[in-house]
Amino acid sequence: MFSTLQDKLHRDRSDRVLTLPQPTAPALAVTSFFEYLVVVSLGKKRGQGTYEPQITYQFPKLANMERSQREEEEKSLKAILLFCFPEGVNWAPLTEYPSETFSFVLTEVDGSRRNGYCRRLLPHGKGARAPEVYCIISRVACFGLFSKIFDEVEKRRQISMAMIYPFMQSLREAPFPAPGNTVQIKSFIPESGTEIISLTRPLDSWLEHVDFRTLFRCLTDEEVLKVFASTVLERRIIFMAEELSTLSQVLHAVAALLYPFTWQHTFISIVPSVLIDVVMAPTPYLLGVQRNKLDDVIDQSDVCVCVCVLCLIGDESTILPEKLQEELLQALCCRRDNSTSEELNKVVSEAFLSFFVKTVGHFSSHVKRSSGRQPGVFQKKSFCKASEHKASQHFVKRFIQTQMFDIFIQEVERRPTQEGFFHKKIAEYQESKKKEKAK
């Protein structure tokens, strides 16, 4: 299925970038901010008018890693080069270029994921020159935190490349904070002296990588609901925009709407030009494609294409129960135009979480267990019949066939006791229903 795509990328198993439907591996305990930083520059090919990306700086060096780890990372670096300059190699030197921040995900063969955070900028200097990319690879999913880190990196880069090392070394040695906590990094800058940089981790860990502002700036509330409907049924969805930062922020925002469920299929927030054949895959995907590639994807008749162009299959407005659609729209109307990122995240996440509470929040009552410690068995039929309304039943019957629900319920079957924010919201909803009945 991906033979053409894989031939372009590798012949050395670096297809890890596009590993297809694999259950997401359990999250590893994160103890540090990042694994390594690379600087990717554009070097002109000899005798040709094109450029090729190349790594000009890395911290820490691969030489400091064990051999097996070094070999794996060398494969990853080939993919990283593509994602730092996804447009390809047809660049011309520039005198002005507004810096932009974007991200991508590296998926390992076992389903575990690492995040690539990028800041692309024009290096300090005179005359026309090619932009360069600073890319941080991390197990941490926290876009806002790394945007602030890049601000500090960029500030030091304008002074000297050598100023980046001590800052990144201090960051690497700092412990990764718990949700809601702050860590302070000391860093020296000539003429400014020692600065203390405070990095605060968001309290809601599943929203660390998310800023919903871009999504709702690009799409209306009604369009967001149509995209959400396509996503919960695991369809093929392509997002298109000119800016890399818009693509990565929109894709991560859409994936976050699924909480407590997790997208289990191909997820590429920015598709490099050489990988554009991925749009022809018959399996579900969430892809971000730059607008100049519109002709390569628009003829895919059963694909939902969003952001700059909205091409839908046609049934999106009928997928979600009508009453719950109205409730979602009402909840989204509660946000203010001048809301902070945190305020908007709260309104949006709670609105969509409430949707799942009302449609599938009764799942635990339909997992039969022979004893407390034994794995349970999910009773699909009784679960579907127990839906509050007929419209919800129709949606639930379709939703339980998705891989994201299947993976979620497998975890429920394995673990007798369930804790977490979703379960807390279910308990609150069930308690409110009891009080209503008692009136």
PLM regions: where:
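Acidic, Ser/Thr/Pro/Gly-enriched alpha-helical scaffold modules and adjacent low-complexity linkers
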Residues: 2-439
